């Protein structure tokens, strides 16, 4: 691998730690994002070396599918698999109760399906993703079907949020999810009850899913730099 900066060294270390927890003869949920990408790379390395056998993945996004094929991880689907032994995924924010905000990559709907079905949901983050309260540094993503965009934005504003349509980078127009929907990013001054807000938003007609993951994560692996060296801790 090429020389990495401190942030990527943390991501690489925590990705390897997650990959080391994968066992042979298992079905693995493959998450989305820059930290999870390292985990997929290391899983692929272990398969090539023969350290792992009979491991298949269920991707949470087109990005995860592309990376899995690149690194030689066989794939399956929820139509075929009868279980998910472990899911490895990143997060944009993690609070002390292991609640998450996800969706920076606009893949949170598929991620929530796979992560919630997993026997063990393992979250991989660098230390910059840890917050005291959700919403402190990251907007809350909400996936919405296109025809409901304006009504949902009005409803989110009534809930105290400041909604804005996520626009594409290096493309004209809004971000379009793998499901063909739009993403609204919402700023809340304080998310005091994540579980209640998650349910309230998901009950709005036209909302497919939002980026609050409450009570889903089992293990958080955190990459840190201590004395100039990347380390990983668990909580």
From Swiss-Prot:
InterPro entries: NagB/RpiA_transferase-like, Ribose5P_isomerase_typA_subgr, Ribose5P_isomerase_type_A. Keywords: Isomerase. GO terms for cellular component: cytosol. The active site is at residue 111. Pfam families: Rib_5-P_isom_A. SUPFAM superfamilies: D-ribose-5-phosphate isomerase (RpiA), lid domain, NagB/RpiA/CoA transferase-like. Pathway: Carbohydrate degradation; pentose phosphate pathway; D-ribose 5-phosphate from D-ribulose 5-phosphate (non-oxidative stage): step 1/1. The keyword Isomerase applies. It catalyses: aldehydo-D-ribose 5-phosphate = D-ribulose 5-phosphate. One of its GO terms (biological process) is D-ribose metabolic process. Its EC number is 5.3.1.6. Substrate binds at residues 32-35, 89-92, 102-105, 129. One of its GO terms (molecular function) is ribose-5-phosphate isomerase activity. Catalyzes the reversible conversion of ribose-5-phosphate to ribulose 5-phosphate. Homodimer. Belongs to the ribose 5-phosphate isomerase family. This is Ribose-5-phosphate isomerase A. It comes from Synechocystis sp. (strain ATCC 27184 / PCC 6803 / Kazusa).
């Amino acid at each position: 691998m090429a020389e990495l900066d401190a942030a990527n060294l943390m991501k690489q270390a925590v990705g390897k730690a997650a990959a080391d927890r994968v066992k042979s003869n298992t079905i693995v949920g493959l998450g989305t994002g820059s930290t999870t990408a390292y985990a997929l790379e290391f899983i692929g390395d272990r398969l090539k070396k023969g350290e792992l056998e009979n491991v298949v993945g269920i991707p949470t996004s087109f990005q995860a599918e592309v990376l899995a094929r690149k690194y030689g991880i066989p794939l399956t689907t929820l139509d075929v698999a009868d279980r998910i032994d472990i899911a490895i995924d990143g997060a944009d924010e993690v609070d002390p109760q292991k609640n998450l905000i996800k969706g920076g990559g606009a893949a949170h709907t598929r991620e929530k399906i796979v992560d919630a079905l997993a026997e063990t949901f393992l979250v991989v983050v660098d230390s910059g993703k840890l917050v005291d309260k959700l919403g402190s540094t990251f907007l809350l993503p909400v996936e919405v079907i296109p025809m409901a965009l304006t009504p949902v934005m009005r409803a989110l504003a009534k809930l105290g949020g400041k909604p804005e349509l996520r626009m594409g980078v290096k493309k004209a127009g809004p971000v379009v999810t793998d499901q063909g929907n739009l993403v609204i990013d919402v700023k809340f001054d304080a998310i005091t009850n994540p579980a209640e807000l998650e349910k309230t938003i998901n009950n709005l007609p036209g909302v497919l899913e939002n980026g609050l993951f409450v009570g889903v994560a089992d293990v958080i692996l955190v990459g840190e730099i201590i004395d100039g060296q990347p380390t990983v801790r668990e909580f």
